[in-house]
C-alpha cells in the first residue's frame, strides 16, 4: 500500500512541475517546457507522456491534431493486443519494463466508465460550445480545451486497457480542464 501511495505522490509532484509550465506553453517556449518535463520525468517517468502532448494541445480547440489523436486512440482500442505489445516494447528499458506482463495488468479490467465520463465533461462541454470557443479564441481556453480533449481520450483508452497504468496518465492534462469548466458553463 505504501509503495502505491508514494508512487502517487511522486507522480503528483511531476504533475505540479508540468502545470507550472502552463505559461511557457502559452508563450510557445517548447525547449524550456521539454527541459522541465525531462526533469519531472526523473521524479516519475510517466511525465514523458507530456512531450508529444504539448504539441497536440497547441492550436485551435478541436484542431486536426486532437482529431488524429482521437483516431489513434480509437485504433489502439480496436487493436488492443498489438497495442499492449507495442507498449511493452516501448517501456522495456524503463522502470515499467514488466508493465504488460505482470499480474496487475493481466487482472486489471480498466477504468470505470463513469469515471471516464465524469472527466470527459469539460471536453463534452467544449464540443457543445465549440462555436463560442472558436469565436472567443482565447489562448488560455483553447489550450485548456485541448487538454480536456486529451484527458477524455486517455481515459477512454484506460477503460479498455489498464486503469492502474493508463488511467493515471490523464492527470497531466486533467487540471487544465478545471480551468476551462467555469468558462464553458
Which functions belong to the PLM regions below?
Residues 1-4, 32-56:
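Membrane-interface alpha helices of multi-pass inner-membrane proteins
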Residues 13-16, 46-47, 176-179:
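Residue-level signal for the membrane-embedded core of alpha-helical transmembrane segments
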Residues 18-31:
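Membrane-interface transmembrane helices that cradle and orient dolichyl/undecaprenyl
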Amino acid at each position: 500500500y505504501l509503495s502505491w501511495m508514494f508512487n502517487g505522490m511522486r507522480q503528483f509532484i511531476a504533475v505540479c512541475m508540468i502545470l507550472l509550465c502552463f505559461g511557457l506553453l502559452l508563450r510557445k517556449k517548447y525547449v524550456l517546457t521539454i527541459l522541465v518535463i525531462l526533469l519531472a520525468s526523473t521524479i516519475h517517468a510517466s511525465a514523458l507522456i507530456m512531450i508529444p502532448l504539448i504539441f497536440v494541445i497547441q492550436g485551435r480547440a478541436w484542431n486536426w491534431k486532437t482529431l488524429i489523436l482521437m483516431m489513434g486512440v480509437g485504433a489502439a482500442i480496436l487493436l488492443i493486443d498489438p497495442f499492449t505489445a507495442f507498449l511493452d516494447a516501448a517501456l522495456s528499458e524503463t522502470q515499467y519494463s514488466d508493465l504488460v506482463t505482470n499480474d496487475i495488468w493481466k487482472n486489471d479490467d480498466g477504468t470505470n466508465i463513469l469515471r471516464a465520463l465524469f472527466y470527459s465533461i469539460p471536453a463534452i462541454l467544449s464540443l457543445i460550445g465549440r462555436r463560442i470557443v472558436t469565436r472567443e479564441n482565447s489562448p488560455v481556453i483553447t489550450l485548456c480545451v485541448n487538454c480536456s480533449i486529451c484527458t477524455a481520450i486517455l481515459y477512454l483508452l484506460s477503460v479498455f486497457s489498464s486503469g492502474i497504468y493508463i488511467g493515471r496518465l490523464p492527470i497531466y492534462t486533467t487540471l487544465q480542464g478545471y480551468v476551462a469548466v467555469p468558462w464553458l458553463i
